Amino acid sequence: AAPALKESIRHGVTTVMIGSCSISMVLSPAEDCADLFTRVESVPRQHVLPLLKERKHWSSAREYAAFLDQHPLGPNICSFLGHSDLRVAVLGLERSVDAHYKPTEADLQHMQRLLEEALDEGLLGLSSMTNPWDKLDGDRQRSKSLPSTYATWKEYRRLTMLLRQRGAIHQSARN
C-alpha cells in the first residue's frame, strides 16, 4: 500500500476519480463492499475482503472523507457515491437485489438524505449502473446483477432531482 501513488504521479496523473459505475465503498459494510467490487473489477475477493475488514472503519460520507484526508495521498482524489453502495446501505444486500421489492417512501427519503450528506462532504455526485452484466461476488447473492440495476425510474428520478438542485453529477453506464 503506497498511498502517495508515486508511480502514477511520475506518469503525469494528477487526479484519480473513484466510485464510478455504482460501486463505492462509502456506506456499506466491508463484506457488502467486497461483494459489490471484486467480481466487477476482477480483483480476488480473498485479498479485498480481509483488507476491508481490517481498514474500513467508516460508514458515512463524513467518516469516509476524514479517512481519505488523513492519508498522504499524492494525486487529488475525487469520488462519486455509488448507487449500489447507497441501495445496500439503505435496503440491505438482499432487498437491494430483489426485483420484487420496491423502496418505500421512507427508504427513498433515507437515500436522499445519505446522498445529500455525501454531497455536503464534497463527493461529486452519484454513479449508477443499468448494465445487467456486472455481477455480485460472494456466496450470499452471487451472480445477481449490481443493486443499481434493480432501481425503479421513480428512485432514479428522486435522486436525480437532488443532484440537479445541488449542481452535482449523475454518472451512469448505459444498458
Locate predicted features.
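Divalent-metal coordination cores built from histidine and acidic residues
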Residues: 2-112, 117, 121-125
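Histidine/acidic residue-rich metal-binding segments in metalloenzymes
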Residues: 62-73, 100-175
